[in-house]
Regions:
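Extended, helix-rich structural scaffolds rather than catalytic motifs
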Residues: 1-38, 244-376
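Inter-helical turn/loop segments and adjacent helix faces that build the functional surface
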Residues: 104-116, 138-145, 171-179, 198-218, ...
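Intrinsically disordered, low-complexity terminal tails and linkers in eukaryotic proteins, enriched
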Residues: 343-419, 423, 428, 436-500
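Acidic/His metal-coordination segments adjacent to aromatic residues that form catalytic metal sites
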Residues: 66-89, 148-187, 206, 254-276
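Long, hydrophobic, well-ordered secondary-structure blocks that form the structural core
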Residues: 88-163
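Alpha-helical scaffold segments that form or flank carboxylate-/histidine-based iron centers
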Residues: 6, 34, 39-44, 83-87, ...
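Long, hydrophobic/aromatic-enriched structural stretches that serve as scaffold segments
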Residues: 55-113
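Conserved alpha-helical segments that form or flank metal/cofactor-binding pockets of metalloenzymes
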Residues: 13, 17-65, 126-151, 231-234
Length: 500
């Protein structure tokens, strides 16, 4: 007999009750005023949800099994496969934090309809963690150079730039539950998952990788519900005018945090780790963030009094350069990574100049020097080209080189009795709003200040099983591999740029 979905959903809602024998206490208190009236836009029932997700899992894992039989892992362009090592180390943490966010919202939001949506999303995020870890395992077992795929959380926690990912994804779970919802569902999932889970898989497929699209597009099929959860939560709290300034502040904060990490990181993977490029990240950002998120999603919220994020114009100014500056910083310090890099060929450089006019004037000489330093017999790494390493921002933990090193927005300010660096006005503003949130951050330089680079690499575990060859390499050539002895000969000392 056919079931009436609305009646079944209403029956499930009837199981909710308000206890009279105990005074409810907020486990995760919120400063937002949350009205009781709200709607779950999908009206999901667990029985239907499980059947739908089971079908998707069967398709995905069945394809991955077939891909192994066709030796697809070794048909992927190696340059592209290497970028999956940091990506698949960082993403499970983001998904795990997203799942914990749903638990916070279930506790904080006294509305059975929204809670039902949060429950389905919590199950989704658990599934996504498993999918991404499995994809890393798939490549670790079947890819020609698995070193680095096995490091996971250990790897990204110790990397200078990848650890900035943790700093951003912690905003999904650290703080006010409604703010976490805005950071995750309204900004992270609605603005940035399309570039990650739709555009990036297209790049993967163009480079011979069909496993990543299978997994990522399966994940993205859940994201529409997560966006709906965010929209329903946002509209609910917007219905109380007292919340508007709090929501606008959260919008301003978390859009900038998402931009400064995701656009730098994902833009680097898309443009610098592709052999067969289907487009540049700058254009993908225009399509998915500006046209789709700002032009469609944000425009619908203007009637509630919500404005586009305060720092959107600065993000637009950054986009032509941000991933190039991030790539230069990452490639300059390639030895402290757990994946291999590749030199940029003349064809690569021509592509960059064509898609980012002026690129060669600002970055071309660096890439020429990088190419000449790829051989360990040259006895130099690109970081030695610079008088010092760039300071790391106290808030976002990214290097203060944006939009470009020659026109960076670095601010070095005395705060709480110590010199602190900020990459932008936005990050300094966030620090001043909640200094206690960021004072405990010990950045990468502070951890390793005064140490020899070789000792740091050994401590981080970025060494291959032979005990001497580095996991990271500045090239993909199986010959002329760098060893820890090559690094020791450099006598390169890690120096905190803000050392007193």
């Amino acid at each position: 007999m056919a079931r009436n979905l609305i009646k079944a959903h209403d029956k499930v809602k009837g199981l909710e009750w308000t206890p009279t024998y105990v005074q409810p206490e907020a486990k995760y208190p919120t400063r937002f005023h949350i009205p009781k009236k709200a709607k779950d836009p999908f009206r999901h029932l667990i029985r239907d949800y499980v059947a739908m997700e089971t079908e998707k899992d069967n398709r995905q894992y069945g394809f991955l099994d077939g891909a192994v039989r066709m030796d697809n892992p070794n048909q992927v362009e190696q340059r592209f496969a290497e970028c999956l090592k940091p990506a698949l180390a960082i993403l499970p943490f983001a998904e795990y934090a997203a799942g914990k966010c749903q638990g916070m919202l279930i506790s904080a939001v006294d509305n059975e309809e929204l809670r039902n949506g949060y429950l389905a999303q919590m199950l989704d995020e658990t599934r996504h963690v498993q999918q991404e870890i499995y994809l890393g395992r798939y490549y670790m077992k079947h890819y020609a150079d698995p070193a680095g795929f096995d490091l996971g959380q250990q790897g990204f926690g110790g990397h200078l730039l990848a650890s900035a990912g943790r700093a951003f994804f912690e905003t999904f779970v650290a703080g006010d539950p409604i703010e976490c919802s805005i950071s995750l569902q309204v900004v992270g999932e609605t603005a940035f998952t399309n570039p990650l889970f739709v555009a990036f898989p297209n790049t993967a497929a163009a480079n011979g990788d069909h496993a990543t699209p299978s997994v990522f597009l399966s994940i993205q099929s859940d994201e529409s519900r997560h966006m709906a959860n965010g929209y329903a939560t946002l509209v609910t709290v917007l219905s109380d005018d007292r919340n508007l300034p709090l929501i606008q502040e959260a919008f301003d904060k978390y859009f900038w945090r998402g931009h400064i990490f995701i656009d730098a990181f994902l833009g680097t993977l898309t443009d610098y780790f592709s052999v067969n490029r289907i487009g540049c990240y700058k254009n993908m950002w225009q399509q998915w963030v500006m046209d789709d998120w700002v032009g469609s999603f944000i425009a619908r919220l203007e009637k509630f009094g919500l404005k586009a994020p305060r720092w959107l114009p600065q993000a637009q100014e950054n986009i032509p350069w941000i991933n190039h500056s991030a790539a230069m910083a990452a490639f300059a310090l390639w030895p402290v990574a757990f994946w291999r890099f590749d030199v940029m060929s003349d064809q690569d450089c021509a592509w960059f100049e064509s898609n980012y006019p002026g690129w060669y004037n600002h970055y071309g000489k660096f890439w020429e020097a990088y190419r000449s330093m790829a051989d360990p017999r040259q006895g130099q790494i690109p970081a030695q080209l610079f008088p010092s390493l760039p300071p790391l921002c106290q808030v976002c933990q990214m290097p203060c080189v944006f939009p470009r090193p020659d026109i960076n927005n670095l601010r070095i300010v005395e705060k709480a009795g110590k010199k602190r660096a900020f990459c932008s006005e936005a990050c300094e503003w966030m620090f001043d709003l909640e200094p206690q949130r960021y004072l405990g951050y010990l950045n990468w330089y502070e951890k390793f200040d005064g140490r020899d680079l070789a000792d740091v690499i050994v401590e981080l575990g970025y060494i291959r099983p032979d005990g001497k060859t580095l996991i990271a390499q500045p090239h993909l050539n199986p010959d002329n591999l760098w060893t820890i002895d090559d690094i020791r000969r450099l006598k390169f000392e890690i120096k905190d740029p803000l050392r007193q």
